[in-house]
C-alpha cells in the first residue's frame, strides 16, 4: 500500500508538465508582466531607479515590498535587516524615514558578469511608498507585498498613503504572512489578495484529488510559483517516507478552478524564461511575476 501511494502521488504532481505542454492556448491576451520588486535582477530592488526602468521596459504592473519606519512612514524594503542590501544595519522599524533615506539601497547590488558593486558610488535611496507611487503611471496596477510584523502599524500606514494618493483602486495588498493578510482584510478601503495558505491548499487539492476546494473567493487575486520545489512526507508505523518534487501546480484545470464562478485573477510567480512565459500563456494565467523586465520585454515578440 505505501508503495502504490507514493507512485500515485509523484504521477499526480509530475504529470502536470506533460499535460500542460499539449494544451491549446488558454487565452488570446498575453499575461500581464509584473516587475518583481520593481525588477530585482536589473537594478537595485524596490528603488525609484528600478521602477522607472521597469516602466520604460513596458511592464504592466509593479510588485513592491513594503515595511514601515519607526515614525510610521511606509517605505520600500524587503529583508528583515538593513545590512542585507544597504550600508546600514538593523530592522527598518528601528529607524526614522529620514535615517532610512540616507542609506544606499544599492550598496550590495551586483550585476551578473560584472565585478564589484556598481551602485556604491551612485546612491540609490530607499524610497517611501508615496514616492514609489508617484514614479508609476497613474493607471498601472500595483501589488504591495507587506513584509513586517506586527501587522497593524504597517497596514494602517499603507492604507493612509493609498487613500491620500488616490492609488487604493489600483493597488492589491499581498502577504505571505496570514496575520498580515487578515489585518489588511479588516482594513477599510484595501483590496487584498487571497491568503497564500488558502491558495496553496486549493492548488494541492486540485493536484492530488482534483477537488476545487476551498471555494474560490470572488474577485480576488491569487498567486503561486509556476514551478515550486516541495517535499511530500508520508507517515508509516515505523517512520516516514519523503519525496522531493519540482511541482507545476498551475495548469489549465487549476486556473479554471480559481476562475470558475468567482472571477478570480491568477498570477504565476518566479517566471524566469520565455518558455515559462509561453506556459503561462498556454494555461491562461492573468499575470506573471518577473525579476528581469529587460529580459521579459522580449518574450511577447
Swiss-Prot record:
Chain segments annotated as transmembrane = none
Q: Which residues form the GP-PDE domain?
A: 31-300
- Entries under PROSITE patterns matching the protein: GP_PDE (PS51704)
Keywords (alphabetical) are: Signal
User: Which segment of the chain is annotated as a signal peptide?
Assistant: 1-22
| Protein source organism | Mycobacterium tuberculosis (strain ATCC 25618 / H37Rv)
Q: Name one GO biological process term.
A: lipid metabolic process
What GO MF terms are annotated? phosphoric diester hydrolase activity
The protein here is known as Uncharacterized protein Rv2277c
* InterPro entries per the UniProt record, alphabetical: GP_PDE_dom, PLC-like_Pdiesterase_TIM-brl
Amino acid at each position: 500500500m505505501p508503495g502504490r501511494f507514493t507512485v500515485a502521488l509523484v504521477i499526480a504532481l509530475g504529470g502536470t508538465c506533460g499535460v500542460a505542454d499539449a494544451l491549446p492556448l488558454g487565452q488570446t491576451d498575453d499575461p500581464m508582466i509584473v516587475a518583481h520588486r520593481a525588477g530585482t535582477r536589473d537594478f537595485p530592488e524596490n528603488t525609484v531607479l528600478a521602477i522607472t526602468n521597469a516602466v520604460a521596459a513596458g511592464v504592466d504592473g509593479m510588485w513592491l515590498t513594503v515595511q514601515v519606519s519607526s515614525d510610521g512612514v511606509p517605505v520600500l524594503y524587503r529583508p528583515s535587516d538593513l545590512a542585507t542590501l544597504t550600508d546600514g544595519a538593523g530592522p527598518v522599524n528601528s529607524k526614522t524615514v529620514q535615517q532610512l533615506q540616507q542609506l544606499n539601497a544599492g550598496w550590495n547590488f551586483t550585476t551578473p558578469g560584472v565585478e564589484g558593486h556598481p551602485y556604491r558610488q551612485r546612491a540609490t535611496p530607499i524610497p517611501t511608498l508615496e514616492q514609489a507611487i508617484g514614479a508609476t503611471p497613474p493607471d498601472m496596477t500595483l501589488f504591495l507585498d507587506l513584509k513586517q510584523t506586527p501587522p497593524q502599524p504597517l497596514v494602517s500606514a499603507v492604507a493612509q498613503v493609498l487613500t491620500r494618493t488616490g492609488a487604493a483602486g489600483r493597488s492589491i495588498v499581498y502577504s505571505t504572512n496570514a496575520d498580515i493578510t487578515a489585518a489588511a482584510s479588516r482594513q477599510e478601503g484595501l483590496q487584498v489578495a487571497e491568503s497564500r495558505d488558502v491558495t496553496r491548499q486549493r492548488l494541492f487539492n486540485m493536484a492530488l484529488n482534483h477537488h476545487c476546494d476551498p471555494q474560490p473567493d470572488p474577485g480576488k487575486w491569487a498567486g503561486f510559483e509556476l514551478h515550486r520545489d516541495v517535499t511530500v512526507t508520508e507517515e508509516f508505523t515505523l517512520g516516514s517516507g519523503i519525496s522531493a518534487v519540482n511541482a507545476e501546480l498551475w495548469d489549465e484545470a487549476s486556473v479554471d478552478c480559481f476562475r470558475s464562478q468567482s472571477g478570480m485573477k491568477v498570477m504565476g510567480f518566479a517566471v524566469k524564461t520565455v518558455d515559462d512565459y509561453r506556459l503561462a500563456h498556454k494555461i491562461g494565467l492573468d499575470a506573471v511575476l518577473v525579476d528581469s523586465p529587460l529580459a521579459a520585454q522580449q518574450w511577447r515578440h
